[in-house]
């Protein structure tokens, strides 16, 4: 009993056990969610093309992702003769682990977060910046021209659009007055358009998507480019680079790359939900809307954002590389910089800047 009352147990070991348990729970839930999000992506693409999509494994094809998992795990990983074996195998692990690490600070409900740090937005921004290393390592270590060219493209593409995402974060910071993700959501609950017009229960009007709609569009398109999703999948352009930086990969390493890609996509959807769509807040703070648990609202908004990602893949043709760069540097960069200046000016001169 003395051990369980000691400072070592109460101050270090027990909080550590709780944090590990929370991390494992988030990891399991996230991996299961990714399995069905991948299935939804394939189903949406199939529906646009007027076909059924996966519908054989399990009822309505619900077990298709798990069958694919089994297929990849049971395959033999083949390493090219000229590849750097250590870096070649480390690259998919780096890509996957960095994508999963971002979920340590993402709140899915009030108090539902592993680590509620005050610089959560900067943490995720830093993690997304580091994810390029996995792709560069894969492209260089494969000792092949297609992966190397894809890695160079990816580096330029991600750097170009991270600048715009950074300005988006600054505008949200100006409006919310904090970099804490939970506090950003709460700021959309207590102040905004609904409060100004005297209808505080109509919380949907407080969401930053309305006053910052141009920045929402910039964030959405930049997130597509950041995660190498169509129409900005120049890194994996099948008609040019076969499979891009993943040309030489198969089996479990390829699975880890795909897992990291979809986790990054869901992370961007969650960030859009928190920054612009009010996180776990209901659209109307009245019954029966506020009877629904916050986690349900959060998931619905994340799925809505993913639907937008999937529809972009299904209906928008791929950009040329020069068009991609021009959009990032000549359109989004000036627009986002101008919006930062406008938002700061309006908040200052209207006297509504957060204290």
From Swiss-Prot:
Keywords linked to the UniProt accession: Cell inner membrane, Cell membrane, Membrane, NAD, Quinone, Translocase, Transmembrane, Transmembrane helix, Ubiquinone
Subcellular location as annotated: Cell inner membrane
Bilayer disposition of the protein: Multi-pass membrane protein
EC main group: translocase
GO MF, one annotated term: oxidoreductase activity, acting on NAD(P)H, quinone or similar compound as acceptor
InterPro entries reported for this sequence: NADH_UbQ_OxRdtase_su1/FPO, NADH_UbQ_OxRdtase_su1_CS
Enzyme Commission no: 7.1.1.-
PROSITE patterns: COMPLEX1_ND1_2
Taxonomic superkingdom: Bacteria
Coiled coil: none
GO biological process: aerobic respiration
Membrane-crossing segments per the record: 17-37, 86-106, 119-139, 165-185, 204-224, 262-282, 291-311, 332-352
GO cellular component terms, A-Z: plasma membrane
Pfam families: NADHdh
Catalytic activity: a quinone + NADH + 5 H(+)(in) = a quinol + NAD(+) + 4 H(+)(out)
Oligomer and partners: NDH-1 is composed of 14 different subunits. Subunits NuoA, H, J, K, L, M, N constitute the membrane sector of the complex.
Functional description taken from the UniProt entry: NDH-1 shuttles electrons from NADH, via FMN and iron-sulfur (Fe-S) centers, to quinones in the respiratory chain. The immediate electron acceptor for the enzyme in this species is believed to be ubiquinone. Couples the redox reaction to proton translocation (for every two electrons transferred, four hydrogen ions are translocated across the cytoplasmic membrane), and thus conserves the redox energy in a proton gradient. This subunit may bind ubiquinone.
Similarity comment: Belongs to the complex I subunit 1 family.
The protein's name: NADH-quinone oxidoreductase subunit H
Annotated organism of origin: Bradyrhizobium diazoefficiens (strain JCM 10833 / BCRC 13528 / IAM 13628 / NBRC 14792 / USDA 110)
